[in-house]
A protein has these predicted regions:
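Auxiliary tRNA-acceptor-end handling modules of aminoacyl-tRNA synthetases
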Residues: 25-326, 344, 358-411, 416-433, ...
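Bacterial N-terminal signal peptides
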Residues: 9-19
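The catalytic-center signature of Zn2+-dependent metalloproteases
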Residues: 358-377, 439-495
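Zn2+-dependent metallopeptidase catalytic core
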Residues: 79, 88, 327-353
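Bacterial N-terminal signal peptides that target proteins for export
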Residues: 1-9
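Conserved catalytic/binding loops enriched for acidic/polar residues
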Residues: 462, 466-855
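Sec-exported extracytoplasmic/periplasmic mature domains
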Residues: 339-350, 450-451, 455, 476, ...
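Bacterial signal peptide processing site
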Residues: 21-23
Length: 855
């Protein structure tokens, strides 16, 4: 099998067994009701007779709607035999999604959210039509019918729906009531609500109905719409905040049935070095000398009109459409940013192959004929997505669908107003927070469209070639001028980067005449490697224990330590100047806390990047025979440099907030809750500056003492004597916080005590962490004992620090005195307020979701 469906010969066996059982059961009656024949008396009607008076919609599959609009009838064409001789009425790609959303990012039921395309086939089983999803994870490419049948019968398929045949024509075409298929909870809304802790919901059939005006049949696709109502009890806070009646949630669902693409599409094998997505499956027809697992690159069909020319127009260009619901000036920013990809296609040898336009009036954003950039509103800022809806057989992209959260641009404006103030807001100047936010939206549009073109994240791209890809998460590149001003003139790059050009060339480009495609594709990646263009993606970057120092989200600079030094300098200036001018006129002064919080944590992502240097590993993805270096541990000197600046982040000077800022923030006005954007508080309604310090200390300490990082420190130091050991890292942390400055004021003494507590708690947690190896836990326990043995002070410590020391000394003694079977009693660390969109918590080392983030 190459592009056709696997044969399900087991269906023939099922029919045979069914017939035999029926014969035994009803032989005494000699019934004429053979289960392989029509059992419904109405089935003797022709389709024309059954649908008389209904509105007909002719297309890929014909639809019939009665005047009441309460039902949907589907005509299926006469059956044809597939490659295995099985009769199939129709095959299609099926995609379901939501036309309207709940509006809550943590729950995730967004407007325009689509499921993954699946292959389905309609077949006849007695007096029923069955809609079945074949199993494409296991195939037998190019094999004969017997080999394909062996694979098909070895793995399960999934029957999605079935219905009794209502009418039939002499040629074998049949009519079925398709209403129940459209009115089912295909998107799993009830399951999602329950899984998100939002109560026990179920689909209410009495309050769910077809949207007949949204049901259309086109030559190559059928689009169906329904309004579904879910009822439940004990609704969670996200449902209460977004649904007018929290016990009743009504959403519009969408279904698409799409004609299968023709077999002219030429697939391209995926390469783990190329930075793209892939369709993966097991090919049981592979030769014994070949790997059984196969990967196909996910990409649009793009064919040169003049393949012999080095540069050619395409037979059909790739066109994206921007949602008319996006307002100006955002709409123009989306058109411009998404349009940057035209440059990459031109460089790959295609003229006018990519363009971006406004969605035609009346066009449905979920219609699979349109690649769409959709503007989505939520009650809080949230994720943006780029979905490449592809043929699961070949990887050919059928529809690109981008969902952009509308509150992102407002959050970016708030971030820049925190750093730069509000004086320039709305002026159109270079440092206008609105203009900077629009620059970010251009980047975001390009980034998400990149996903729908088949490209994955490249989280190392911000470290080379002047920010080499829009597929990284771009932190604004800010700096401090010699006269102490924050310079935002180079905040975001414009246009395609060096890696973007490579990735599109590899994915869509054509080998020159006379050169084999595989050879040419390898040369494209070899040239990129020679230019030190790295590709590191989510698996390299997102985990808190990740190892590569250059695989980071929201970072800048080729060296993480240099990047942290720069971020700390920008943060210092922003905090020193923070005041009433950082919030717009007429806003409640308490809202200064929303502006201050991201300024205080401005360096959080560079902290996360610098943590990866300690116990870090510098590597590249490679294939056998490509000549790339495997890499090795980060040099010891660089690891110790990183450790030193991370310890500096625990100093009172870094943790404190100027008193000029502390007194600015009053309690919140009546009726305004703190929300999820802010840190927790231990001081009731009053601003809690010390909680921010506790959070910052926890990020540094817990990141350094992650079990995977500690395991690497153990292994690296035993192999290379010049690299820091886990014992050295624990001892350095302990000495820094257990021997404070004797001249510290009470103000700083409390902050020193907070840092001490973070270190002791972090080592205790590591010693008790079941994920850590015995060797790591043993060193953590030894480090705790060593910490208690350190000299308590030089000179006379502040009373505040002494109180913390005495408290933690008792805690450590109690820790060691616990019975062996007792549960751990390590207190939890405070968590950072969201940097990525609401819905996930992170220590700044990663984010959750497809595309998210602070900036």
């Amino acid at each position: 099998m190459r592009y056709g469906l696997p044969t399900l010969a087991c269906g023939a066996l099922f029919l045979c067994l069914t017939s035999c059982v029926s014969s035994l059961r009803f032989s005494a009656k000699k019934s004429s009701q053979d289960p392989l024949k029509q059992a419904d008396p109405q089935a003797s009607l022709s389709i024309g007779e059954k649908t008389r008076g209904m509105r007909a919609c002719s297309g890929f599959l014909d639809l019939y709607l009665p005047p009441s609009g309460e039902a949907l009838w589907l005509r299926l064409p006469p059956p044809v035999r597939d490659e295995g001789g099985r009769l199939v009425l129709a095959r299609a790609l099926y995609v379901e999604g939501l036309e309207s959303g709940l509006g809550s990012n943590p729950v995730g039921l967004d407007r325009g959210q689509l499921g993954s395309p699946v292959l389905v086939e309609f077949s006849r089983l007695g007096n029923r039509v069955v809609l079945e999803r074949p199993n494409l994870r296991y195939r037998a490419d190019g094999a004969d019918a017997d080999e394909r049948r062996a694979v098909d019968e070895s793995f399960a398929s999934s029957v999605l729906w079935a219905a009794v045949i209502a009418a039939e024509d002499p040629d074998g075409a049949v009519l079925v009531d398709f209403t129940s298929f459209v009115l089912r909870d295909a998107h799993g809304v009830a399951r999602t609500l329950v899984g998100a802790g939002q109560g026990s919901f179920h689909l209410d059939a009495k309050r769910s109905f077809l949207e007949s005006a949204g049901c259309h049949a086109f030559p190559d696709n059928v689009e169906l719409s329904a309004r579904l109502t879910f009822t439940g009890e004990n609704p969670g806070r996200h449902v209460r905040s977004t649904s007018p009646d929290p016990n009743t949630v009504s959403l519009r669902a969408h279904h698409s049935l799409v004609r299968l693409p023709d077999v002219d599409y030429v697939h391209r094998g995926a390469d783990p070095r190329a930075g793209g997505f892939a369709v993966r499956y097991a090919n049981y027809a592979a030769g014994l000398e070949e790997p059984i697992h196969r990967s196909l690159a996910v990409r649009h069909r793009l064919v040169a009109a003049n393949p012999g020319d080095a540069s050619s127009a395409p037979v059909e260009p790739i066109v994206y459409y921007v949602d008319r619901g996006a307002p100006e000036p955002v709409r123009s920013a989306l058109l411009e940013g998404a349009g940057w990809w035209a440059e990459a296609f031109t460089a790959a040898g295609f003229e006018d192959a990519f363009r971006v336009e406004l969605l035609p009036e009346g066009a449905h954003p979920l219609d699979v004929r349109y690649n769409v950039i959709q503007w989505v509103h939520r009650s809080t800022r949230g994720w943006s997505y780029g979905n490449a809806l592809s043929d699961p057989r070949t990887g050919e992209i059928i529809k690109g669908h981008v969902s952009l959260g509308s509150l992102r641009v407002r959050q970016d404006r708030l971030l820049f107003e925190g750093l730069l103030g509000t004086a320039a807001t709305g002026t159109g100047a270079a440092d206008d927070p609105i203009q900077l936010s629009l620059a970010r939206i251009r980047q975001l549009a390009a980034h998400e469209v990149g996903h729908t073109l088949g490209l994955a994240h490249n989280f190392s791209a911000s470290t080379y070639a002047g920010r080499a890809s829009v597929m990284d998460y771009p932190a604004p590149l800010l700096s401090v001028t010699p006269d102490g001003e924050i310079d935002s003139s180079n905040a975001y790059a414009v246009g395609m980067g060096a890696w973007d050009l490579v990735a599109i060339r590899w994915l869509y480009g054509r080998a020159p005449e006379g050169i084999a495609e595989d050879e040419w594709l390898s040369s494209v990646l070899a040239d990129a490697a020679d230019r030190d263009l790295r590709y590191l993606s989510d698996s390299d970057a997102r985990s808190p224990g990740a190892a590569h120092p250059l695989a980071n989200l929201w970072d800048n600079f080729s060296n993480p330590v240099t990047g942290l030094e720069n971020a700390l300098a920008v943060r210092r200036v922003a905090l020193e100047r923070f005041g009433l001018d950082n919030l717009g006129a007429g806003q409640p002064r308490a809202h200064l806390e929303e502006v201050l919080t991201p300024v205080y944590f401005h360096h959080r992502y560079q902290v996360g990047a610098t943590i990866k240097v300690v116990g870090g590993v510098d590597y590249s993805h490679s294939l056998i025979g490509d000549g790339r270096s495997v890499g090795g541990p980060v040099e010891g000197e660089e690891q110790r440099r990183a450790l030193a600046i991370l310890l500096d982040c625990l100093s009172p000077e870094r943790l404190d907030i100027p008193e000029s800022v502390n007194h600015l923030i009053p309690p919140r006005p009546p009726g305004q809750s703190r929300g999820e954007e802010l840190a927790g508080t231990t001081t009731g309604p009053a601003f809690d500056a010390l909680e921010l310090a506790r959070i910052q200390c926890a990020q540094v300490v817990d990141g350094l003492l992650h079990p995977e990082r500690c395991a690497r420190l153990v292994d690296q130091s035993r192999r290379f004597s010049d690299l820091p050991s886990l014992e050295e890292v624990i001892a350095t942390l302990s000495e820094r916080v257990y021997q404070p400055d004797p001249a510290a004021t009470p103000r700083h003494g409390e902050l020193q005590g907070i840092a001490l507590g973070a270190v002791v708690r972090g080592i205790m947690a590591l010693a008790d962490d079941a994920r850590a190896t015995h060797g790591v836990r043993a060193r953590a326990r030894s480090g705790l004992r060593g910490l208690l043995a350190l000299p308590s002070h030089v000179g006379d410590p502040s009373p505040a620090w002494r109180a913390h020391r005495d408290y933690w000394a008792v805690e450590v003694e109690a820790f060691f005195a616990r019975p062996a079977q007792a549960l751990p009693s390590v207190p939890d660390a405070p968590t950072l307020p969201p940097g990525g969109p609401i819905g996930g918590r992170s220590l700044g080392l990663g984010a959750y979701g497809e595309c998210s983030g602070h900036w």
